Amino acid sequence: MSARPYVLAETAWPALSDAGVTVAVLPWGATEPHNFHLPHGTDTYQSDALAAEGARRAWERGAKAMVLPTVPFGCQTGQRDLSFAPGLLPSTQQAILRDLAHDLERRGVAHLVLFNGHGGNEFRAMLRELQPGLRLHLLLVN
């Protein structure tokens, strides 16, 4: 068994076949400069760590939560001229979110918590557009 059975990337398939996961947590960061003192992965590292801690606490209280692998690319159109600040368009983010939500819903997940770690990611309008077409409940943590 994984030391963190609530983190998908660290969990082997046999443990997942009967896990009964009802809550999926999707950390979403960005890869961009943070002045001279912080690494490009700051937004991703923070959202990943905070999502895992939240899932740990939920797991300890009996919730069947699972943290999905963190999406490391955000929307940072204002940093397109900076070296190695790869980003996604909002339409690409929405397509990723839509596809994952439908896939998770098909697998019986009841709630998808989007854990946003980057100020340039604007998910509220996307969630409002996607929610009516889903049985799965979308939640946003900014």
Regions found by a protein language model. Give the residues of each.
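Active-site histidine-anchored catalytic micro-motif
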Residues: R4, T70-N142
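Short coil-to-beta-strand
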Residues: D18-W28, A63-C75
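Glycine-/proline-rich flexible loop or hinge segments
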Residues: A30-H40, G78-A85
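Active-site and ligand/interface coordination hotspots across diverse enzymes
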Residues: M1-L38
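Short catalytic helix/loop segments, enriched in acidic residues and glycine
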Residues: D43-R56
